[in-house]
Amino acid sequence: MDPISAVSEELAEIEGQINDIFRALSNGFQKLEKIKDANRQSRQLEELTDKMRDCKSLIKDFDREIKSLESGNDASTNRMLNDRRQSMVKELNSYVALKKKYSSNLASNNKRVDLFDGPGEEHMEENVLLASNMSNQELMDKGNSMMDDTDQAIERGKKIVQETINVGTDTSAALKAQTEQMSRVVNELDSIHFSLKKASKLVKEIGRQVATDKCIMAFLFLIVIGVIAIIIVKIVNPNNKDIRDIPGVGLAPPAMNRRLLWNHY
């Protein structure tokens, strides 16, 4: 018998669901390795991410169930359960690392933007023709003008980069705060979900106990009705030998015919 099943059937059920997801993740990443199309890779990564999210939620349920049973278990059992939970977390983290790796590779493969575009051949020929018709002073003036334009473009670029960095910093801080808030909300929702599942199981247990009590009461009622019926039959027909007397229930014997004796003085 599985040691976790011996501790709690609910723990064993959660472990089975987690193992099913781990098998699906293993097969999914093997399939992803063979996919060459970027769009199909992206869809496959989304499906695997959803499975990892479900697995994380189940591991949280597993941890809560361990804590709820901790006081009733011995030290070796608690150590075994905690080791199993840590093994689950480690395996899930390995799949998360794989997902990040494939996501990074996919982003790199999709990036096809050239940072610098070289001048076209016709434009280069036009510049050569213009330069051949200009004097040295004009060429120097033109060069200085182009350098000034380049310096101004660099300054504008620096300002844009600095503004982008500032916006990125503010956005990062806002996203961090929102992420922490969402994490707290998710934890609260997981706790509520776990409590609802426990309450549902408790209601089912109470329902089964009530049904059992009703069956026992019905059986006792039938016994009482049977005893009353036997007593009535014995009273109505006391000479019926087919019905035995009920132990502990005495019936008065039928009155014998008595004769009145008269004393004559």
Curated annotation (Swiss-Prot):
State the name under which the record lists this protein.
Novel plant SNARE 11
Classification via CDD domains:
SNARE_SNAP25N_23N_29N_SEC9N
Similarity remark = Belongs to the novel plant SNARE family.
Tissues where the protein occurs = Expressed in roots, stems, flower, siliques, expanding leaves, but not in mature leaves. Not limited to dividing cells.
Question: Membrane side Vesicular: which residues?
Answer: 237-265
Gene name as annotated:
NPSN11
Q: Which InterPro entries match?
A: NPSN/SNAP25-like_N_SNARE, Sec20_C, T_SNARE_dom
Spell out the subunit comment: Interacts with KNOLLE to form a t-SNARE complex. Does not interact with SYP21, VTI12 or VPS45.
Natural source organism = Arabidopsis thaliana (Mouse-ear cress)
Name residues in a coiled coil.
30-75
- On whether Transmembrane is a keyword of this UniProt record, the answer is yes
Location within or outside the cell: Membrane
Q: Which domain of life is it from?
A: Eukaryota
Membrane topology (UniProt): Single-pass type IV membrane protein
Enumerate the transmembrane spans. Answer: 216-236
Q: Name one GO molecular function term.
A: SNAP receptor activity
| Keyword terms, alphabetized | Cell cycle, Cell division, Coiled coil, Membrane, Protein transport, Transmembrane, Transmembrane helix, Transport
